[in-house]
Amino acid sequence: WYNTADKAHYIEGDDKNRTVLVPHTGSNKIFQFNFDSSTGVLKLKEGGVLNTGEQTGPRHIQFHKNGKWIYADYEQGNAVSLLRRSNGLLVTKQIVPSVPETWNGGGACAQLLLSPDSRFLYVANRGHNSIAGFEISKKNGQLSPIGFFATEANPRSFAIHPNGRWLYAGGQDTGKLAVFDRNRDNGTLLKRETVDAGIRPWWLQLVKY
């Protein structure tokens, strides 16, 4: 067992199998562990706790395929951040809202996913009931909004097909799944249909069989 902090919500490892990150929605911290793939042992990196600030609530985290850029969404802060490593430790390089600046209806971020080619980032917004899309700068990883795409109510989870052509978002309050065509050139989403998904769809996972 590894003691972290209040409300560890998610865990993500890098492609090199050396680093594991754990965001905490309750304590506003991201823990950075060294991972020994031969033993499975995690060890907290010295100085490896990033404080993201009060009322942020880091929830999900993803590594860009280049290994340099890391993205986290902030549940209470309705925002997404770009992180990098400086001397091996996480530092915040950018924070952008996940909802329109004119929105004052509250809500909370849920899931965060990169497109299969790591050119775009998507964040689910509960309350605003949307998927926010961002283009990723090839130069520095900075995020630029490309739009907010309406979903079913309370989109807690979504998934992107491995070929990048479709995005599926579950509406926890409606019991329906919204199916989007995804433009692989500009990242925009176009809703095609909604289908019944049972009672309060909690998590979406694409499975090959």
Features from the language model and the residues they span:
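Beta-propeller fold detector
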Residues: 1-3, 42-50, 91-98, 143-150, ...
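Beta-rich, blade/repeat-based domains predominating
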Residues: 1-19, 51-69, 99-118, 151-166, ...
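Conserved beta-strand positions in repeat-built beta-propeller and related beta-rich domains
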Residues: 14, 22-25, 64, 71-75, ...
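Structural signal for beta-propeller blades
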Residues: 28-30, 78-80, 129-131, 175-177
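Short loop/turn segments immediately following beta-strands, especially the blade-tip
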Residues: 33-42, 83-90, 134-141, 181-187
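Oxyanion-binding "anion nests"
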Residues: 73, 78-85, 89-121
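C-terminal hydrophobic structural anchor segments
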Residues: 132-180
